[in-house]
A protein has these predicted regions:
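ATP/NTP phosphate-donor binding region
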Residues: 4-75
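Gly/Ser/Thr-rich loops at beta-strand to alpha-helix junctions
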Residues: 15-21, 80-86, 107
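A glycine/threonine-rich phosphate-anchoring loop and its flanking beta-alpha core
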Residues: 90-192
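A conserved active-site cap/scaffold subdomain adjacent to cofactor or substrate pockets
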Residues: 187-201, 205-277
Length: 420
């Protein structure tokens, strides 16, 4: 996209904070390059801008008005981070055009994604849109962003560790094969990007190169794969459950997705440690199949775990990955037959929970449930919800099918556990 060569006018979309940080400079740069820059759309800094359908409609309506005034398809340029990007992304889709984004914080992996998480009547849904055609970061600006935003991005990128392990599990079970190209986009640079937590907390621009690249590549991988599997696993469902419960919504700014994901990541790393302490190659498959509940029993358990519409949602999602006794036998035989290779891949992928908790803490990200207003008991209670919440197959499902799930959760929260 070259706005100058296309002769299309542009509209900078920002809030008062991001306008001061970068929006004003972007607007001036457009004008000095000979681009027709419409009067910018700048939202108030307070109250904190919310990713709501109404706010997206405000942007789309402004674009339609400007289209009529200029006789051209005005190009929206989002200047900001998650909320500004998501709102502009949806507005651009509504008016049928591409957009550009100038990122102001390394706060999440959604810059290059095609989805926009938007609140519609109090329910968060991911709207399928079109990814931006251009993404620009100035690392000096990114490094100067509020540290809480950097910590959020660090937590979001950290999720790729257990999320990747869950994909390995799903591949071994024959449910969702690994795409090696997409896998490399996400995983090849994750460890390096997460290796400088102290420098990130200090605001060293050089350290931000890897973090920004990792977040951008994660979004691109989701585009290529046409789904979120490359960038998330069960750890994200902890965050989703807590978002539905409005955990941290009363903070200013509200508790970010990345902060909640950081705790979900540690919960899953701790679970994986206990899971790998056991030898799945020695699993008594006959006993596991004999103990496997029928669907009616599973549905009853789901409805005792969730309430209302969320229970209906979880039933629908879990039904997709549920198998009967014969299907379970075939699945477990497949996983056990490949367990030596799968275990080696998991051990290469994963990081010890205590080690990673220290990295998160040094980056300024949450490392204890109390950091996000929860208790260890709250996290424990979220495990069954995270298992049932989505149809995506994860280690929680395999542990349940092996008959280990309840014991492993108990071990995670034993007296010698990560948070006890």
């Amino acid at each position: 996209m070259c706005i100058r060569d296309s002769n299309l006018p542009a509209l900078v979309v920002a809030d008062e904070r991001t306008w001061a940080v970068a929006g004003k400079a972007v607007d001036a740069g457009l004008r000095s390059a000979g681009v027709v820059a419409c009067d910018p759309l700048v939202f108030p800094a307070e109250p904190c801008l919310y990713a709501s359908l109404d706010n997206a409609h405000t942007i789309a309506d402004r674009l339609r008005t400007l289209d009529a005034e200029t006789g051209s398809a005005v190009v929206p340029i989002a200047v900001g981070s998650g909320t500004i990007n998501d709102l502009t992304k949806l507005a651009a889709k509504d008016v049928g055009r591409r957009y550009a984004v100038v990122g102001t914080a390394a706060s999440m992996d959604g810059y290059t994604g095609a989805g926009a998480p938007i609140s519609d009547n109090g329910v968060k849904v991911t709207m399928q849109c079109v990814a931006p055609q251009v993404v620009i970061f100035d690392l000096d600006i990114t490094a100067a962003a509020p540290q809480v935003m950097t910590a959020s991005g660090y937590g979001d990128l950290a999720a790729k560790i257990p999320g990747g392990a869950d994909w390995i599990i799903a591949d071994a079970a024959g449910i969702e094969p690994l795409d090696q190209h997409v896998w490399a986009l996400v995983q090849s640079g994750v460890r390096d990007a997460l290796s400088r937590p102290d420098d990130l907390r200090r605001g060293d621009p050089e350290a931000f190169s890897g973090l920004v690249e990792g977040l951008i590549l994660s979004g691109l991988a989701m585009q290529v794969y046409d789904g979120t599997r490359p960038a998330s696993g069960a750890e994200h469902y902890f965050s989703h459950i807590w978002e539905l419960a409005h955990v941290g919504a009363d903070r200013n700014p509200p508790l970010s997705h990345g902060h909640k994901v950081a705790i979900g990541t540690l919960a899953m790393l701790a679970f994986y440690e206990k899971f790998l302490d056991r030898d799945l190659s020695r699993l008594d498959i006959d006993a596991a199949v004999a103990a496997w509940p029928d669907w009616r029993t599973v549905e009853s358990d789901i409805r005792s775990t969730f309430e209302g519409a969320l229970a209906d949602h979880a039933v629908k999602e879990t039904k997709v990955k549920y198998v009967d006794a014969d299907g379970l036998r075939a699945r477990l035989n497949r996983v056990v037959d490949r367990w030596h290779e799968t275990r080696a891949a998991l051990e290469k992928q994963l990081v010890r929970a205590r080690v990673f908790a220290d990295q998160l803490r040094r980056a300024g990200a949450p490392s204890r449930p109390e950091d996000i207003g929860l208790t260890a008991a709250d996290v424990r209670a979220t495990f069954p919800k995270a298992m049932y919440y989505r149809s995506r197959y994860t280690v929680l499902d395999l542990a349940r099918e092996a008959g280990w799930y309840e014991e492993l959760v108990e071990e995670v929260f034993a007296p010698d556990g990560l948070w006890t």
